[in-house]
Amino acid sequence: MAAPEEKALQVAEWLKKVFGDHPIPQYEMNSRTTEILYHLSERNRVRDRDISLVIEDLKQKASEYESEAKRLEDFLMESVNFSPANLSKSGSRFLNALVDSAIALEIKDTSLASFIPAVNDLTSDLFRTKSKSEEMKLELGKLEKNLTATLVLEKCLREDLKKAELQLSAEKAKVDSRLQNMDFLKAKAAEFRFGIKAAEEQLSARGMDASLSHRSLAALSEKLSELKEQTIPLKKKLESYLDLMPSPSLAQLKIEEAKRELDAIEAELTKKVDMMGL
C-alpha cells in the first residue's frame, strides 16, 4: 500500500496531467480528499492502460488486415485480372467502406455470415459499455456527494473546535483571575495575621492587660448583655412593689433592698462598660 506522501504526489501528478495547461481548482488537502482522488487516479490509470492495450491491438489487427487485403488484391489480380483501380469512384468508396468495417469489426472476411455476428457482438459491447459508464457515473456522483458531505462536516467540526477553543480560553482567563484573587486574599490574610501578631506583641510589651484583648472584650460584651437581661425582672419586681399599698415601713424596706440590688448590678455594669471603653 502506498504511503500518504506517495499518494499525495501521485494525485498531484494526475491532476496536472488531467488539467494540462489549465489551473487546477483549489481544494482542501487532507487524508480524506487525498484518498478519494487517489482511487480516482488509480481507476483512470487502469482505464488508460486498457485503452492503450486496445489501441495497440487494433493497430496490430489493422496491420494484419492490410496484409490480408494486399494478399487478396494480389490474388484477384493474378486470378481474374481484377484491380481496385478499375473500379468506379462509388465502387472504390464502397470497397473502402467494406474494408474499414471489416477491420473495425475484427472479422476474418467480408461475408455476411461474418458481419452479422460481429455487429451483434459490437451492439452488445456498446450496451455493456453504456451500462458500465452509467454505473461509473453513479459511483462518481456518490463519491462527489460523500466528498461534499465530508467537507461540510469538516467545516462544522472546525467551527465547533474554534468555538470550544474560544470558550476554553475564556474559562482559563476566569480561572487565572480567580487564582490571582485567591493569591491576593492569601497574601492579605497573612499580612493581617502578621499585623495582629505584631500589635499584640507591641501591646503586651506596653503592659496591656490580656483581659482587654478583642476576645476578652467580646466575652465581656456577652456578659454585659446577660447582666442587662438579669436587671429586667428586678425592675419589674420593683415596679410591682411600687404599685402595692402595704405598710409604709415594710414597703420602704423592700424598696431599699431592691434599689441596693439594682445599684449593685448597675455598678458592675458601669465597671464593665468602663473597662470596655479603655
UniProtKB/Swiss-Prot annotation:
A Gene Ontology biological process term: centrosome cycle
Coiled coil as UniProt keyword: yes
Keyword Acetylation appears in the UniProt entry: no
Coiled coil region boundaries: 49-79, 128-178, 249-277
Keyword list, A-Z: Cell cycle, Cell division, Coiled coil, Cytoplasm, Cytoskeleton, Microtubule, Mitosis
Major location (coarse): cytoplasm
Compartment(s): Cytoplasm; Cytoplasm, Cytoskeleton, Microtubule organizing center, Centrosome; Cytoplasm, Cytoskeleton, Spindle; Cytoplasm, Cytoskeleton, Spindle pole
Cellular component annotations (GO), alphabetically ordered: centrosome; cytosol; HAUS complex; mitotic spindle microtubule; spindle pole
Classification via PANTHER family: HAUS AUGMIN-LIKE COMPLEX SUBUNIT 1
Protein family (similarity comment): Belongs to the HAUS1 family.
Protein function: Contributes to mitotic spindle assembly, maintenance of centrosome integrity and completion of cytokinesis as part of the HAUS augmin-like complex.
UniProt subunit comment: Component of the HAUS augmin-like complex. The complex interacts with the gamma-tubulin ring complex and this interaction is required for spindle assembly. Associates with microtubules. The interaction with microtubules is strong during mitosis, while it is weak or absent during interphase. It is unclear whether this interaction is direct or indirect. Interacts with EML3 (phosphorylated at 'Thr-882').
Designated name of the protein: HAUS augmin-like complex subunit 1
The organism of origin for this protein: Mus musculus
